[in-house]
Curated annotation (Swiss-Prot):
Organism: Arabidopsis thaliana
Comp. bias (Acidic residues): 256-270
Biased composition (Low complexity): 287-305
Name of the protein: Protein KOKOPELLI
Domain of life assignment: Eukaryota
Tissue occurrence: Mostly expressed in pollen and open flowers and, to a lower extent, in closed flowers.
Function statement: Positively regulates reproductive function by facilitating male gametophyte formation and double fertilization.
Disulfide bonds: none
Length: 492
């Protein structure tokens, strides 16, 4: 029997038991589902038989799912109020449980053609109390709930086990295949650490790899080989050159091995690997000079070197043909856009070249007004080039630049009429039209009366009229009133 069918049957039994409890407790039930006492006892008996049979079937099913085959029948799953199957089951439907399946054996009926009396019937008749019936039904419902929960738990566990088993079988290869893959990968790992001569000996034996190789091989990079086994060097990748400083590798003689140190970044460069013959070293030198010549524009800014390093390299380069200047990135105190080679210049000219930190100090001084820009230096043309420094200076100095332009105007322009910039010349026509309209509008107004031609009296005459003929003046020789000089006598 399938687990789904067992679960459905157990749920049906639970519904019937709940209906029986509702009738025994005289709860509200529709008229069609009401049962009398005899029907209740008979239904209780039938449900006990059916539940016992389903419990046994479920125990065998759970044992099969968990891959446990019990040799004995689980008596704990049988209800307490149900007698043994040999006593309660009719002879015609007697069932025998063998391991994980149920075989039904029909016994011949008795000669009289009647069934044996069931002991369960006597038990029910001897104890017809409804209280006992209700308790037994409640216990049966609890057992059914327990069986349902156990069935759901086991089914979910079996599903999860099958899911994990399928994932493992898909991802993990068999042990034999893993062993073969590991054995096949060993020659490949050994060949990475072999010299060229040893690889040529083993080249006849080819290693075959399986097509469906599911193992991920993580191999560490090969360690540096001894100098005698290396015939050349590889070109560094562009991404590595842009991210960090790469050592400048040059072929040297068999007896010479030089090490150069970067003073600015305190990074030790790799040992120089000698070439096998002189002809191979010359060919490699020409090829590397051609490869580096087109890429110094992007990597010159990140691969600067000090002057002391250039001096040590110039000594080691004396026994080799000259290389292109672009093939080696050298430190210059000027920014990366300058292409001058300061190592070729005499000592006096190198002293006059402004250092990088000094140039930064001058620019910061120009921004914060404690240092003035001197135009006699050779870098006075920096303002013409667009740069972030010039934009930053323009934000700080835009007001001062306008004042300096006003000071440079000629004297005739400043003393004459006020002049405006070319960009503020608009608006003359509009002003002319507004003046004409205003004149036309006020021309119709009544004009003021013309003033009389009579001469205006002076203020001192008005004072004489108001004060009755004269003004009291202290005794002085001469008093100036208005525009005339009056000589006063003592009689006044």
């Amino acid at each position: 029997m399938e687990p789904n069918n067992v679960e459905r049957n157990l749920q049906s039994l639970r519904r019937l038991y709940s209906l029986l409890v509702a009738n025994a407790r005289n709860e509200y039930i529709p008229e069609a589902y009401k049962l009398d006492d005899n029907t209740q006892f008979l239904l209780k008996r039938l449900l006990d038989f059916a539940s016992h049979e389903h419990f046994v079937t479920q125990s065998n099913l759970l044992a099969t799912q968990l891959r446990v085959f019990p040799k004995t029948v689980l008596h704990g799953a049988k209800p307490s109020n149900v007698a043994d199957s040999s006593e309660t089951t009719p002879p015609a439907m007697l069932s025998q449980i063998n391991g994980s399946h149920i075989t039904r054996v029909s016994k011949p009926l008795e000669a009289k053609g009647t069934l044996q009396r069931d002991l369960r019937v006597d038990q029910i008749r001897s104890n017809p109390s409804k209280d006992v019936l209700t308790e037994e039904v409640v216990d049966a419902i609890e057992q059914i709930d327990t069986q349902l929960s156990a069935l759901s738990f086991v089914s979910s566990r079996v599903d999860s086990d099958e899911r994990t088993r399928s994932v493992k079988s898909f991802v993990t290869p068999p042990t034999e295949e893993c062993r073969q893959n590991s054995q096949a990968s060993m020659p490949c790992l050994r060949s990475n650490y072999m010299t060229v001569s040893q690889k040529s000996v083993i080249s006849g034996a080819e290693v075959t790899f399986p097509y469906n190789d599911q193992l991920v091989r993580v191999t560490s990079p090969p360690q540096p080989l001894p100098p005698r086994a290396v015939s050349g060097f590889k070109k560094p990748n562009q991404s590595n050159r842009a991210s960090q400083k790469m050592p400048i590798m040059k072929p040297t003689l068999m007896d010479q091995e030089t090490e150069t140190f970067d003073d600015d970044s305190s990074e030790t460069e790799a040992d120089q690997t000698p070439s096998a013959t002189g002809s191979e070293s010359e060919d490699e030198e020409v090829s590397t000079s051609q490869e580096y010549s087109g890429e110094t524009g992007s990597s010159s800014g990140s691969e600067w070197e000090t002057q002391a390093e250039n001096d040590t390299e110039s000594k080691s380069e004396s026994s080799y043909p000259p290389q292109n200047d672009d093939s080696v990135s050298e430190v210059s105190t000027s920014p990366p856009h300058t292409d001058r080679d300061t190592s070729r210049e005499p000592g006096k000219q190198r002293r006059n070249v402004m250092g990088r930190f000094k140039r930064i100090k001058n620019k910061i001084g120009q921004i914060f007004h404690h240092h003035h820009h001197h135009h006699h230096h050779h870098h006075h043309h920096d303002k013409e080039k667009p740069s972030a420094w010039n934009k930053l200076q323009s934000k700080f100095h835009h007001k001062h630049q306008e004042k300096s332009k006003e000071r440079k105007r000629p004297m005739s322009e400043s003393k004459g009429l006020t002049t405006h910039k070319q960009q503020h010349q608009g608006g003359h026509f509009h002003a002319l039209v507004e003046g004409l309209v205003r004149h036309r509008k006020h021309s119709k107004k009544q004009k003021h009366q013309l003033k009389s031609d009579a001469k205006k009296t002076e203020w001192w005459k008005l004072l004489k009229k108001r004060q009755g003929g004269g003004v009291k003046i202290p005794k002085r020789g001469r008093v100036k009133l208005g525009k005339k000089k009056h000589y006063l006598s003592k009689n006044v």
